[in-house]
Amino acid sequence: MQRYLFYSATSDIWKVERLKLPADYHVKIWVPKILSMAPRELMSSTFFVWWLFHWLKVFKNPCYKIYLVYTKDKLLAHYTVLLPAHFRFPFMHRSDLQIGPVGTNERHRRQGLAHYVINSILKEHENTTVRLWYVTRKENEASKKLIEGANFSKIGE
């Protein structure tokens, strides 16, 4: 059985850094549109369901988006999903957001891409009262190090 850790922080606690994306990469932010269910590289039933959740207002707020990091050759190197509160985690309040899932192509790991994107999300919400959540598998040391470095606290298991 997989064990998960739950982390959380608010803008008065999390740490925003001045980070620079490596020169060979650029970020695009995807938002749901009627005829765009997911970025083409991420088309799957999971992303289709989230697209439906957005349009059917299952998500408790309209902030669903996906941060995409591309190489100069237009290949997807990394993605981070920002999910609004919904029934899966009933403890989340209406304005809360979950960072994740997060995925980095193996060839692009250790470039600071996840760190950069998560920092961008923190910066985007630094003057708000939103609570951000992060869920990771207990054995995922890199993921735990990433979010603990942003001053998120482990809330539960």
Language-model-detected regions and their locations in the chain:
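Acyl-donor-binding surface of acyltransferase catalytic domains
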Residues: 1-52
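Conserved active-site alpha-helix within GNAT-family acetyltransferase domains
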Residues: 138-156
